[in-house]
Regions:
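Helix-turn-helix
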Residues: 36
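Adenosine-cofactor binding site in Rossmann-like domains, unifying the SAM/SAH pocket
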Residues: 30
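FMN-binding flavodoxin-like domain, especially the glycine-rich phosphate-binding loop
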Residues: 2-7, 11-27, 39-133
């Protein structure tokens, strides 16, 4: 049974998003089909964000970032996983993204996870963030 108030948003990392959604009983939504109504009708989000090699958000995520800025996130819980990017090059951009979400009312839950880094463990991360979603 899917928990409709939790949405896992992804771009090219669909397999990871589906694994997270299965663990949470959530639905997945492609960043390319994300819209304001989905933001308004959902309580919690897991964002599998992607960054360009030189730092900023990928173009699809830049679009969704604008959607999030245009909608109140007050009372919404957000967990952020960097599905494509690394903390050395993209860390400052990831923090800026989180700050924008906070300024718009979102409650960021858990630590930011960088997929594929040394010691990353998706199961542990999902267990850590799930009680707060």
């Amino acid at each position: 049974m899917k928990h409709e108030s939790i949405v896992v948003v992804y771009d090219s990392c669909q397999a990871i998003a589906e694994e997270i959604a299965d663990k949470l009983g959530a639905e997945t939504v492609s960043v390319q089909s994300m819209n304001i109504r989905q933001i308004e009708n959902s309580q919690s989000f897991v964002l599998a964000v992607e960054f360009q090699a030189d730092g900023p958000l990928s173009p699809h995520w830049q679009y969704v970032s604008q959607l999030f800025r245009g909608t109140s996130l007050s009372g919404k819980n957000v967990a952020v996983m960097v599905a494509l990017g690394n903390s050395l090059v993209n860390g400052i951009y990831a923090e800026a993204f989180n700050s924008e979400l906070r300024l718009n009312g979102a409650h960021i839950v858990g630590d930011q996870l960088y997929a594929g880094t040394s010691g990353w463990n998706l199961d542990n991360w999902v267990c850590a963030v799930s009680p707060n979603l």
